[in-house]
């Protein structure tokens, strides 16, 4: 009888012991949680820099970048975008994204600029002077560029020949955005070029940013939004020192023969009105 009673009590004793052990473990866990120390960025990087092995272990555990996308505010200068990043502008927000993490910037995308493309273009897009000399007489191919200048006057066409960076930027942008139409404004002896996009979103690839910022000097290149239109601005900060020899008379004669169709005239008028309001 005594033996039966002892056996019946055993499960109860074990249950109380198990419950007590769980409570102790729970208390220890709570204590550990309370003892968590949060480090500031400077403290974390200071620790990693002094303990090389810890830094390597931390990097091994990373499978994605710490930050793939940063919010940007318009207007944004191209020079302020960190190398290796692109720009994505939309009604829902604007951001700069790591190029290799962007679907649009991958080599198989039309926005990408691969080594093969560089070779095919004979590196023309990587040199302002070379690109200008190769394209300045291709008046029909760059019809929109020259007709927009002619909308001011033939003297404005001549004036543009002293600013090779304008035709260079237009040629680069046209490779990525074939349907662009530039608008020009004059500020004394210098011309500023604006490219207007009417799409809801605009992606400026890492390749475009890299090519323009690496090769165009003394210009403020920026993106802004006005009345639902995205506007890229190419504004000179100083007169260009250009010693390139071009046949001005020949180019002006070719421009004078261009057909300024009603459709292009309307696009020119609409664009000029938008830019005038944008600048006021």
Swiss-Prot record:
Protein's cellular compartments: Host nucleus inner membrane
Keyword set, alphabetical order: Host membrane, Host nucleus, Membrane, Metal-binding, Phosphoprotein, Zinc, Zinc-finger
Domain of life: Viruses
UniProt GO MF annotations: zinc ion binding
Post-translational modification: Phosphorylated at serine residues in the N-terminus. This phosphorylation regulates the localization within the inner nuclear membrane.
BP GO terms, sorted: viral budding from nuclear membrane
This protein's GO CC annotations: host cell nuclear inner membrane; membrane
Similarity section: Belongs to the herpesviridae NEC1 protein family.
Protein task: Plays an essential role in virion nuclear egress, the first step of virion release from infected cell. Within the host nucleus, NEC1 interacts with the newly formed capsid through the vertexes and directs it to the inner nuclear membrane by associating with NEC2. Induces the budding of the capsid at the inner nuclear membrane as well as its envelopment into the perinuclear space.
Subunit structure comment from the entry: Forms a heterohexameric complex with NEC2. Interacts with capsid vertex specific component 2/CVC2; this interaction directs the capsid to the host inner nuclear membrane to initiate budding.
Protein name per the record: Nuclear egress protein 1
Organism: Alcelaphine herpesvirus 1 (strain C500) (AlHV-1)
